[in-house]
């Protein structure tokens, strides 16, 4: 039992009979073991520095898979990267009150909180600007006219009076003083928009065909699939705090592409021809491991996914990444590096174990040729 728990039990010793004392001592030991399992401050296993206590309880709750992944590196004698330590010490979604206190004091965040607040879409931009940038989430890049007008009003009220369009069909506002950060976040939600998980080690804004629903050549309208994935992420805390950022894009097979092969997961609409083992019709071809700006394009896995199963398959892929992505080296923590280390087949085997069924494969000759399209025919 730790010094703290022994002291606590001793302090109470005059108030309880021997049986109650034994119970309290056991209880306090259990508390310490539980804190060690979570890497909590004041526990015997400090975050990022030591393995779990022998016999410590398994982590539970929505963050359990992330804690187990971190524990595996610690038990191998490795050190977690600083962002992993920050997440382990205090989960960003448990720190909203701290963000509010900083806003009241117009206080700039220190390094750990600067990382944590990115889970809310806030990036402190020092030394270039002594202010935050706030990035939204706009699935498939589509918002209502009154929401766009509302963002303009918020930029005038809480930011620098302007917003930038991002490469993921998104909007972000700059020059947000710390005192205005919380007011801006809550006003964004009043508009029916959000910024949750738009930065740091999270699944970023989902992209879809820019002309979805009006492209005369599209095989499928990507909007409902991007929207489903968007709300799936928002409502599952276990999908936050990945080893590194994660991008998903849906391409509808039209004249205007979404550049899905620059994403960690690319769902590319294809038409399967008759005469093969796969049911003919429109499917998503599954691409994995792209990284924007690295000249690493997502690889065709040979797998095809029914559109209505896209969210389920993407969820399984993300959970395998959560369990096996690198938590020690930020430069090697993207999905691509798991694929490089394992190979696609081993990775897909793990995904299929998560799903509980095999994913269909379609040979290249089963896929109908795509009509002419222009990969540069987009803005951003």
What are these model-predicted stretches?
Residues 13-20, 307-309:
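Structural motif
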Residues 22-31, 35:
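Aromatic- and Gly/Pro-enriched helix-to-coil junctions and flexible linker segments
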Residues 2, 42-48, 52-56:
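Extended, prion-like low-complexity intrinsically disordered regions
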Residues 52-380:
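Peripheral terminal and linker regions in Fe-S/redox and tRNA-modifying enzymes
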Residues 20-21, 314:
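Short runs of predominantly hydrophobic/aromatic residues within well-ordered alpha helices
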Residues 36-41:
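Short, tandemly repeated low-complexity microdomains enriched for cysteine and small residues
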Residues 2-17:
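Intrinsically disordered, low-complexity regulatory segments in eukaryotic proteins
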């Amino acid at each position: 039992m730790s010094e703290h728990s022994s002291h606590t039990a001793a302090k109470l010793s005059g108030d309880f009979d021997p049986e109650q004392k034994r119970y309290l001592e056991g209880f306090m030991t259990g508390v310490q073991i539980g804190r060690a399992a979570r890497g909590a401050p004041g526990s015997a296993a400090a975050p990022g520095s030591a393995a779990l206590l022998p016999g410590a309880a398994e982590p539970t709750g929505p963050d359990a898979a992330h804690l187990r992944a971190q524990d595996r590196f610690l038990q191998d004698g490795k050190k977690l990267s600083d962002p992993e330590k920050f997440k382990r010490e205090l989960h960003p979604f448990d720190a909203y009150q701290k963000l509010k206190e900083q806003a009241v004091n117009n206080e700039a965040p220190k390094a750990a909180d600067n990382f944590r607040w990115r889970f809310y879409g806030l990036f402190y931009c020092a030394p270039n600007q002594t202010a935050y940038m706030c990035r939204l989430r706009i699935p498939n890049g589509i918002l209502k006219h009154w929401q766009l007008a509302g963002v303009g009003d918020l930029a005038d009220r809480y930011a620098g009076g302007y917003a930038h369009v991002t490469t993921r069909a998104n909007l972000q506002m700059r020059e947000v003083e710390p005192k205005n950060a919380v007011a801006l976040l809550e006003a964004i939600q009043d508009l029916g928009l959000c910024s949750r998980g738009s930065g740091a080690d999270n699944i970023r804004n989902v992209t879809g065909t820019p002309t979805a629903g009006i492209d005369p050549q599209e095989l499928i309208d990507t909007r409902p699939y991007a929207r489903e994935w968007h709300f799936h992420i928002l409502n599952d805390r276990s999908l936050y705090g990945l080893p590194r950022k994660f991008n998903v894009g849906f391409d509808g097979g039209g004249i205007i592409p979404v550049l899905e092969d620059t994403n960690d997961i690319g769902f590319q609409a294809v038409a399967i021809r008759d005469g093969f083992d796969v049911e003919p019709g429109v499917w998503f071809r599954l691409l994995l491991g792209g990284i924007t700006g690295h000249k690493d394009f997502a690889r065709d896995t040979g797998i095809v996914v029914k559109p209505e199963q896209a969210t389920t398959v993407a969820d399984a892929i993300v959970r395998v990444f959560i369990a096996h992505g690198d938590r020690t080296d930020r430069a090697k923590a993207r999905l691509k590096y798991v694929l490089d280390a394992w190979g696609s087949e081993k990775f897909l085997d793990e995904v299929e174990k998560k799903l509980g069924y095999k994913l269909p494969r379609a040979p290249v000759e089963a896929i109908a040729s795509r009509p002419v399209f222009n990969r540069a025919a987009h803005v951003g």
